[in-house]
A protein has these predicted regions:
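Non-catalytic, mostly N-terminal accessory regions of nucleic-acid modification and defense proteins
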Residues: 1-143, 232-236, 240-242
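SAM-dependent methyltransferase catalytic region
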Residues: 104, 112-113, 117, 123, ...
Length: 272
């Protein structure tokens, strides 16, 4: 009903957060968390990957929709084994959880507030924390593909793909491009196979990525596994068992030398 004085009556609604707001909040969250972690560990490289492990743990538990804090430590141990250097035995990784698990509540609040922008936050968070740690020598040259670029590149994927189709990202970064292809192909193929796990495994067999930075290659692998669980969670309950089913084809150089694919004679290993 129009008010008598000619004003237009409006209904006030709470605005949804924008992608820019989500990115800004993620930067702030990353800075605060990294400073707390590195303030205690005084090791930029380890602090960076502990931060990523904590964030990945939070994302996994959100996908799993499990409120049990008793199992979060087990999830952290599982995920951190793929992100932290192999010399960090379970006892060391468990001590990291005991020291910094309080940060998870901040991550949970972020995911709840910006639920529409959870995809790929792991790789973006790595980019932000990498610039803070300044330990790899690669942070000044890393460029992460924006979503609009990925959408432009992937819109040409045919609706009917063959079993022999292969998708390669030779500089895969945090795996955002491959993650979007995984999502797109899952939508196309799931109804045909009617088996979500088999569908995801078949798609992973067609996705390949190489990354010069071994830490970022590990992030890409974890990022893809989280995306796989997000898709799986749409049709069934997920668990740590499902996590162990998937092994993305992400590779990095055995002995990184800065040349990557430009090196005439280089060998790679698959991220575990």
């Amino acid at each position: 009903m129009k008010p008598a004085d000619g004003r237009v009556q409006t209904h006030h609604t709470v605005e949804s957060p924008t992608a820019r707001a989500a990115r800004t909040a993620l930067k702030k969250l990353t800075v605060n968390a990294y400073q707390e972690i590195n303030g205690k560990l005084n090791n930029p490289s380890t602090s960076k990957m502990v931060f990523v492990s904590l964030l990945a743990t939070t994302i996994f538990c959100d996908i799993q929709n499990d409120e049990s804090s008793n199992e979060k430590d087990d999830v952290f141990l599982m995920i951190s084994s793929e992100l932290l250097e192999i010399e960090f035995k379970e006892s060391s990784r468990r001590s990291f959880w005991e020291m910094f698990s309080s940060l998870v509540s901040d991550f949970e609040k972020y995911i709840y507030r910006y639920a529409d922008y959870v995809d790929d936050i792991l790789s973006w968070a790595y980019q932000y924390v990498n610039k803070l740690s300044l330990d790899s020598g690669l942070e000044s040259t890393q460029f992460f593909t924006e979503e609009y670029m990925i959408e432009y590149l992937t819109k040409g994927i045919p609706r009917t793909t063959t079993a022999s189709s292969v998708y390669l990202d030779p500089a895969c970064g945090g795996g955002n491009f491959l993650s979007h292809i995984l999502n797109q192909l899952f939508v196309l193929r799931y109804r045909e196979l009617d088996n979500p796990i088999a569908c995801i495994e078949n798609i992973f067999n067609a996705l390949y990525g190489y990354e010069l930075d071994p830490n970022l290659a590990a992030v890409a692998s974890v990022n893809l596994k989280l995306k796989a669980l997000m898709l799986l969670a749409k049709v069934q309950q997920v668990s740590t068992v499902d996590w162990r089913l998937f092994c993305p084809n992400i590779f990095t150089s055995v002995e990184p030398n800065g040349f990557g694919f430009l090196e005439a004679d280089f060998s790679t290993h698959r991220i575990r």
